[in-house]
Amino acid sequence: MAAEFRPRLRLLATSRRRWCHDVRVAQSEDPEDFIAPAAHRVRPGTLLLANTDLLEPTFRRTVIYIVEHNAGGTLGVILNRPSETAVYNVLPQWAKLTTKPKTMFIGGPVKRDSALCLATLRVGMQADGVPGLRHVQGRIVMVDLDAEPDNLAPMLEGVRIFAGYSGWTIGQLDGEIERDDWIVLSALPSDVLIEPRVDLWGRVLRRQPLPTSLLATHPIDVSRN
């Protein structure tokens, strides 16, 4: 499922700077927060939802946000796999900016000893030309964990840090989609920083048209049916 890919990641053991801003997630009035465009192909900013028949524990009922998709392969992070490890214990300088529950999320099975950070820009902010930020889609950006935090804090609603990632080589993901392992859908900015108590998998499906939305009624534990 996951394959070797070489993104720009931050090794967890190399963090040194201190974070000194406590930025809370703000109320947004951006229209794109509520309307996701139709997704017909994989590209940065799309979601991969595990289909109901994908029962492999690593990816069952996962929602993967695609960060990179190019000639080198595809990279994404699982949005709904929180760990019990506090960000403060791993990257303390980012703890105050991290949205609740302020824990590391498991981005996937590849390179679990490295970290990747996504953030949501405040409404009206642009990432173009800002050192330390790389635009992904809409208000979602990738954050360089080696950047100067003081310069980025005023622009960001919040961040989420992922240990590891999910990756595919050229053509590998296409094959998995063809055999219906994944459903390709568009993301809303709120999906990236969603609280773990929310069933993101079901939430994304429920906002789709019929018949896709009916998949949200699929039981979590099919053995109980």
Predicted region positions:
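A short aromatic-anchored loop/beta-hairpin motif
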Residues: 9-12, 16-225
